[in-house]
Amino acid sequence: MVKVKICGVKKLESALQLDGLVDYIGFVHSLLGGPRSVPLEAARIMASQIEKSKTVLVVHGSSPSYAAAAADGFDVLQYHEPLLPSSAASLQATLDPLGVTLAVVVEYTGSAWKPQEPCGYINELNKEGVEPEYILLDTTKGLRDRIPLNEAAKASRCSHRVGLAGGLTPRDACKAVETGVSLIDVSRGVETGVPGVKDPLLSAELIMGAKRCSS
């Protein structure tokens, strides 16, 4: 069964509505700002109220050391920067005593991947002994193109930990699931107005579609 992550949650009400309905709830903390970014303490307060779903701190625009220090109190740290496999191993070792798992990101620029092509990256992570919570395929910020589904399918054959993001909506759920990824990650696609405020009906449509198409 595919897992579902709804990311970029800014309001406690949205987080509580999603608790137990999705596998992961993501809170973005970006030092570069952004419409879905929240202060670290606000993210921690929301995460502390979540009882069933796993909480993910998505850190962008910071060093690995800052991200590791910020991750205490969350279930997963998603370091949303291209991260070399050796650096991922170091970051994972820092997080292990906290009981926090690491999620890494491979960014699609429209013509290339950062830090490298997904299957090659997965192979290098394996060599370093890194076992991430998931390996998220996402688009570079500002890119209008989506990740080609055949590329997601190729990556999913290299690891059972691959997740797919990058502008997905509830209508895309089945096509995303058909690539074989283990996780779909949606943010803006379940919003109708204010960034970070998740629409309950769109969220339900996404969840039901993902589960139905992967059952």
UniProtKB/Swiss-Prot annotation:
Residue intervals passing through the bilayer: none
Pathway field: Amino-acid biosynthesis; L-tryptophan biosynthesis; L-tryptophan from chorismate: step 3/5
GO molecular function, one term: phosphoribosylanthranilate isomerase activity
Keywords: Amino-acid biosynthesis, Aromatic amino acid biosynthesis, Isomerase, Tryptophan biosynthesis
Reaction(s) catalysed (UniProt annotation): N-(5-phospho-beta-D-ribosyl)anthranilate = 1-(2-carboxyphenylamino)-1-deoxy-D-ribulose 5-phosphate
Enzyme Commission code(s) on record: 5.3.1.24
The protein's name in its UniProt record: N-(5'-phosphoribosyl)anthranilate isomerase
One GO term (biological process): L-tryptophan biosynthetic process
InterPro entries cross-referenced by the UniProt entry: Aldolase_TIM, PRAI_dom, RibuloseP-bd_barrel, TrpF_fam
Top-level class of the enzyme under EC nomenclature: isomerase
SUPFAM superfamilies, per the entry: Ribulose-phoshate binding barrel
Amino-acid biosynthesis found in the keyword field: yes
Family: Belongs to the TrpF family.
Superkingdom as given in the UniProt entry: Archaea
Keyword Magnesium: no
